[in-house]
């Protein structure tokens, strides 16, 4: 199974599936918020926080060595600036309690990586709440010739990730959107709604820019990501932030053509809960958006060859605008209605439930 993803919505499902089937994750590299933003402000690098998060979600923590390494990589520095710098120094010198638990080779790898990235950080860098995993991945990025995919592969190997993680692109870019009211917003963190800034008008368009000055740019897919798409037994546009996590992957040159050429089922799982990015959008408009982005790279492609099915749970949730059965039938897009949503108790989508449905789907459509 291959997922176009980013963010945390699929994290638990990915962790469950990793124990049972082979999964591949194509992850966006255009975010501009949180710990990623602090790094991108002082270094010319792609966003790597979502890649780090997915790699660690796939780690084989049945091993004590890996479990301790994952704990060290998941650690975030304190939010107090002086405490953050002090703890960072403890990490660099290998004396932090989490570092002392590591195997010698893992501790040395972390110490060298953090020391190397420290040399590249400007005085403007904010250490508070920084992700240790992001800092180490940035160090590997520079050590491997400014290449994110080899850095991700190295981290995958060290944590014995059960599955593959691919950066959708090595190119540097940020996300920009235009709202229906005509306003343009540059930067994923400014429109995703995760910090309370919900877009005041529906998102009408999305594209990539080189920087926050707004220069539009075309980027190309990382070759290994295209290869993974061509080999997939099932392609999935999963739950998650629709524009910044799912649609963002489809803006990249080569992805639409690879999806069209892939000889496998292609399934869209719309968000059953509220997604701040989807204000004013219905299920039809979401599918139309996916098709528009994919057809920009593969013009004239039939809808069913890009989005063959939608997976919904009408028993436990409601979808904005309802299920457009006639429209879907007209476009030869199938409806798969399965129970996988927990309507009352968290998590809203239990990873075990969705994983089971996807496994059954892969078998039935394979």
Give a label for each model feature.
Residues 1, 8-15, 22-25, 34-36, ...:
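Conserved catalytic alpha/beta core of Sir2/sirtuin-type deacylases, generalized to analogous enzyme cores
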């Amino acid at each position: 199974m291959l997922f176009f993803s980013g963010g945390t919505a699929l994290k638990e499902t990915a962790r469950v599936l990793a124990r049972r089937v082979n999964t591949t994750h194509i992850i966006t590299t255009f975010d501009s918020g949180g710990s990623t933003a602090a790094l991108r402000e002082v270094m010319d690098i792609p966003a790597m926080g979502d890649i780090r998060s997915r790699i660690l979600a796939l780690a084989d923590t049945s091993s004590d060595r890996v479990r301790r390494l994952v704990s060290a990589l998941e650690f975030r520095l304190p939010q107090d600036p002086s405490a953050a710098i002090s703890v960072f120094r403890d990490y660099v010198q290998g004396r932090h309690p989490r570092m002392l638990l590591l195997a010698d080779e893992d501790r040395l790898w972390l110490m060298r990586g953090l020391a190397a990235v420290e040399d590249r950080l400007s005085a403007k860098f904010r250490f508070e709440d920084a992700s240790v995993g992001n800092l180490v991945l940035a160090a590997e990025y520079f050590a491997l010739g400014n290449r994110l995919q080899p850095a991700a592969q190295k981290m995958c190997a060290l944590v014995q990730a059960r599955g593959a993680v691919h950066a959708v692109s090595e190119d540097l870019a940020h996300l920009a959107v235009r709202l229906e009211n005509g306003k343009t917003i540059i930067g994923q963190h400014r429109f995703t709604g995760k910090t309370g800034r919900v877009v005041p008008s529906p998102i009408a368009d999305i594209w990539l820019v080189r920087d926050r000055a707004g220069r539009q740019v075309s980027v190309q897919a990382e070759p290994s990501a295209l290869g993974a798409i061509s080999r997939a037994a099932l392609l999935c546009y999963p739950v998650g932030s629709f524009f910044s996590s799912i649609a963002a992957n489809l803006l990249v040159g080569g992805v639409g053509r690879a999806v069209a050429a892939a000889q496998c089922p292609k399934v869209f799982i719309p968000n059953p809960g509220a997604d701040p990015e989807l204000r004013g959008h219905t299920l039809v408009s979401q599918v139309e958006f996916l098709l528009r982005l994919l057809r920009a790279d593969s013009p004239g492609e039939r809808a069913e060859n890009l989005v063959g099915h939608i997976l919904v749970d009408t028993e436990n949730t409601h979808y904005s605008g309802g299920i457009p059965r006639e429209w879907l039938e007209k476009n030869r897009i199938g409806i798969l209605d399965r129970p996988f949503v927990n309507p009352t108790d968290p998590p809203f989508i239990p990873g075990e439930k969705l994983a089971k449905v996807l496994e059954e789907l892969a078998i039935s459509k394979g």
